[in-house]
Amino acid sequence: MSREKYYITTAIAYPNGKPHIGHAYELIATDAMARFQRLNGMDVYFLTGTDEHGIKMLQSARKEGITPRELADRNTSAFRRMAEVLNSSNDDYIRTSEERHYKASQAIWQAMVANGDIYKGGYAGWYSVRDEAYYGEEETEVRADGVRYGPQGTPVEWVEEESYFFRLSAYQDKLLDLYENNPGFIMPAERRNEIVSFVKSGLKDLSISRTTFDWGIPVPGDEKHVMYVWVDALTNYITALGYPDTTDERWAYWPANAHIIGKDISRFHAVYWPAFLMSAQLPLPKRVFAHGFLFNRGEKMSKSVGNVIDPFELVERYGLDQLRYFLMREVPFGQDGSYSHEAIVNRTNADLANDLGNLAQRSLSMIAKNCEGKVPQPGAFSEADKAILDQADAALETARKAMDDQALHLALGAIFAVVAEANRYFAGQEPWALRKTDPARMGTVLYVTAEVLRRVGIMVQPFIPQSAEKLLDILAVPADKRQFADVLASPLAGGTDLPAPQPVFPRYVEADEQN
């Protein structure tokens, strides 16, 4: 039986500097969504990569006295290494400087030409190098420093040059119909409202080529023009699936189930991209989800501003799964969030070390001592036993619904509510006291606790994969019994030998800090 396909992408990162925590946040969250759907039985394809063309790359390279290709090669290797360090399960890594991407970008350009949507004209307007975006005069403002800024707070400059244009104005009504008929196309709702309002205010045709630099994909048939970076960048999502060869087996993954992006690029993904696809007569992605910004104690991070936090250092300092857990649990996905040393330590020590780690250590140590290191044979389940087992089952359904809406924090919240309840159950049943008074009941309580840990261990795999693997290993859960379908279908069998219990989550102790 062929499994349902699920295609998910991050935005491709811009490698004019080193990776920062914002890149890591998007990759970790998207990785968790990809892992979740794999465990849910889907045939998943997960793409990330780097967006290597454009004037910013050229300017950054010139400052360093190297070519843009050298800059792209050097910095892309740091982004690839970040994906490895973060334990990202991406199926492909795309670079827009690859030959396959030149082919795909030129093919979508020609498809838009064939549809009558590209024409040559002259462009004069305000352009932000940092945003790689054009803005109308009404979207800009001159501040006290005498500099004109765009809506993202970045400086804009006046640009005049010959340009090809895309007839974006012809797609205004089609886009508004799309948003109305598919309210889930752009999420969360705040982003959707912004996009609808932007499109309703009137769309102007879009300049889609430049002649003032040559670091980009040449326009087919007019090589002195290179494609405006967003035509090139957005096309990466179909390049990776073999476009323009729609007989490629990977093409079956299109349309994408979700493009996960930062909210600052929602206009490109929710307005320009569907319009380009409509013009090229290609199916539209099912969802564009724009997450919020991460603030370091309240200040927005940006490579261009220079206040970025190195994700490699954070992993080194706190541990990978601790960082993954914190970012997905602490910040409602789609909203802006803030982080600090104290917040990371408090959240990971409380939830991971105390609640989950400690429960596993206490219950499995008791099984090792009192049950010959084997899963105990349970007796009849009491109401309390059934209640905690039922809550664990219900959490999976809650998590599935939450993940359908990219609400990672709600999925984790439901799973960790089970962990908190399991701690209350364990404390209330007092298996250490039952050892003398009712050893059979003690065995049942320890069985139920271990079984809840097994269910939780399976459910947390997308979020904290290495730690979940350790937990499932010490519960002797076979490698082929770790899918979501196994939460109900494959309970622990009494009499199974368990390995010696190992701590799963070390506590973060300030004394460990060597500054």
Swiss-Prot record:
CDD domains: Anticodon_Ia_Met, MetRS_core. It is an enzyme of class 6 (ligase). Its main location: cytoplasm. ATP binds at residue 303. A motif ('KMSKS' region) lies at residues 300-304. It holds the Pfam family tRNA-synt_1g. InterPro entries: aa-tRNA-synth_I_CS, Anticodon_Met, Met-tRNA_synth, Met-tRNA_synth_2, Methionyl/Leucyl_tRNA_Synth, MetRS_core, Rossmann-like_a/b/a_fold, tRNAsynth_Ia_anticodon-bd. GO terms for biological process: methionyl-tRNA aminoacylation. Keywords: Aminoacyl-tRNA synthetase, ATP-binding, Cytoplasm, Ligase, Nucleotide-binding, Protein biosynthesis. It comes from the Bacteria. It catalyses: tRNA(Met) + L-methionine + ATP = L-methionyl-tRNA(Met) + AMP + diphosphate. A motif ('HIGH' region) lies at residues 13-23. Is required not only for elongation of protein synthesis but also for the initiation of all mRNA translation through initiator tRNA(fMet) aminoacylation. Monomer. PANTHER family: METHIONINE--TRNA LIGASE, MITOCHONDRIAL, METHIONYL-TRNA SYNTHETASE. This is Methionine--tRNA ligase. It comes from Brucella suis biovar 1 (strain 1330).
